[in-house]
Amino acid sequence: MEWSQELWLLIKYLLLGLFQGFTEPIPVSSSGHLVLLQHFLGIEIEGLSFEVMVNFASLFAVIAIYRFDLLKLVKGSARYVLYQDAQGKGDFRISFYLLLATVPAVLAALLFKDWIETELKQLHVIAFALLITGMALWLIRHLNGRKQDGDITLKDALLVGLAQTAALIPGISRSGATIVAAMGLGWRQETALRFSFFLYIPISLGSGVLAISDIVQDPHFTALWIPYTIAFIGSFIASYVSLLWFMNIMRHGKLIYFALYCWLAGLIVLSLLS
């Protein structure tokens, strides 16, 4: 009996890792879906460390896919800072904008963390947030501006960073909010997508570092390190595949698919609550 329970525990965390990993890159709100999954399927997640682990897995998947672009950005920024190399000025500017755009979400998370945890993880809030995400995606479904990396302004970066704070609400997609804001400002789809996922790196890394003390003190981390590791691997693979798929969807201008899904998910949740 004990071995079957242990097997189910491993399967559960693998499925949770795959689920979170697949929903993280696409504009459907992975945090909102995780809350819905726990409520409607009665799945309990033991410990505080799980979400941090699977988010780190998604972070590594993003870095793996954009590794050459990121390496260019880091090298160019370093050349500009160390040697005042004019060729690296554009890379340094984008790096600065990414850090600046991270600030609003970090401040909002620090100021309103407890309120978000207690008040916003309500099912009706998530349902309405999904409907809003769907509407935002629908509004920009045909947009494809002309702004590339060299055309991004300080104001653009701040506005996209402010949009990212909306994703603190479960049901509002982080990638969706930032891509909608960027494309609304006239960015090209490819530029908006890349900046959105570059912006995911500091916010995810920062939240993970801040949570290290919680992980160390979490008694479940030691007891569940094998299931957590399996969830990490599953989340990495699912995030990698999901992001590549999302990039292909964006190239073909099919954001409407995600808008329809968010509407459907939001309406189903509301109907189940009524």
Curated annotation (Swiss-Prot):
Name used for this protein in its record: Undecaprenyl-diphosphatase 1
Q: What organism, scientifically named, is this protein from? A: Halalkalibacterium halodurans (strain ATCC BAA-125 / DSM 18197 / FERM 7344 / JCM 9153 / C-125)
Q: Name one GO biological process term.
A: cell wall organization
Identify the keywords attached in UniProt to this record, alphabetized: Antibiotic resistance, Cell membrane, Cell shape, Cell wall biogenesis/degradation, Hydrolase, Membrane, Peptidoglycan synthesis, Transmembrane, Transmembrane helix
- Is-annotated flag, keyword Transmembrane? yes
Its biological purpose: Catalyzes the dephosphorylation of undecaprenyl diphosphate (UPP). Confers resistance to bacitracin.
- Topology in membrane: Multi-pass membrane protein
The chemistry this enzyme catalyses reads: di-trans,octa-cis-undecaprenyl diphosphate + H2O = di-trans,octa-cis-undecaprenyl phosphate + phosphate + H(+)
Name the EC number(s): 3.6.1.27
